[in-house]
Amino acid sequence: MKFRAIAALTALLLFAPAFGTPRATEAAADKKDLAAELDALKSQVVQLAHQAQDADDYIAIANLQRAYGYYVDKCLWDETADLFAKDGSLEIGLRGVYAGQDHVRKYLHTLPKLEYGMLFNHMQLQPVIDIAPDGKTAWGRWRAFEQFGMLHKAAQWGEGTYENEYVKEDGVWKIKKLHYYMTYYVDYYKGWDQGGLPAPGPLKDFPPDQPTTVQYKLFPDVFVPPYHYKNPVTGK
C-alpha cells in the first residue's frame, strides 16, 4: 500500500505542471477573446439592424409625403385625409389649424374638385427627414412648388416650405402635423418681380379649430420658417 501511495504521489508531481502550461493559458485567453468578439459582432448586428430600419422608415415617410402631393394634385380629398393620424392636424398658410383627422377631411372638402381646364399641382421637393431614436416619431422639412390655373381664366405660381411631424402607428407612418408656410403666391403673367398676392386667411364658412400658430408675411417680405433640425455640420 505504501508503494502504491508513493507511486501515485510521484505521478501527481510529474504531471501537475501540465495543468498550468502555456497551452492551457492560451486556450483560456482564446476563449475570452472569442467571447469578446461575439459580443462585438452582436452589437454590430443590432446597430446595422437599427440603420436598416431607419432607412426603411425614411423611404416610408418620403413616400407618405409624396403621396400627399399626388393626391392633392388631383383633389382626392378623402385619400389625402386618410394619410393623417386620428389626432393629426393641418395648417396651411394663415388659415389656422384644423385639429383631428375628421376636421382635416372636412376642410379639404371645402377646396375645389378637379374639373376640365383646372391645374392644381403641388410638387413635393427637397426633403430633410429626421427620425427619433425610438423610431416612433419623425420630422420632415420639404419644399412645395405649385402651379394653379383655370383654362383661359387665371394662372398662379406658388412656393413654400413644410415643417411636418410624423408618427408611426401599428407599423405604419402617418402625418401627425402638417404645417405649410407660404413663401410666395403670384400671378403667372406678372411674376414675382411685381410682388405677390396676400396669403389666404381663415375660411368664414368653416373656421379653424385654432388660430394661426405663426404670423408672417409673404414675399416680398422676408420670413424664414423655423427649422426642426440643427446644422448637420456644426450641430448648432
Please report, for each region that a protein language model flagged, where it lies by residue.
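Bacterial N-terminal signal peptides that target proteins for export
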Residues: 1-8
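Bacterial N-terminal signal peptides
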Residues: 8-18
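Short, low-complexity N-terminal intrinsically disordered segments enriched in polar/charged residues
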Residues: 25-70, 74, 82-83
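A solvent-exposed, acidic/Ser-Thr-rich amphipathic alpha-helical stretch
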Residues: 77-146
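Short, surface-exposed coil-to-beta transition loops
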Residues: 122-124, 156-162
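Short beta-strand edge/turn micro-motifs at domain boundaries
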Residues: 137-139, 159-192
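Beta-strand elements of well-folded, non-transmembrane domains
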Residues: 144-148, 166-168
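A hydrophobic membrane-anchoring alpha-helix module
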Residues: 192-236
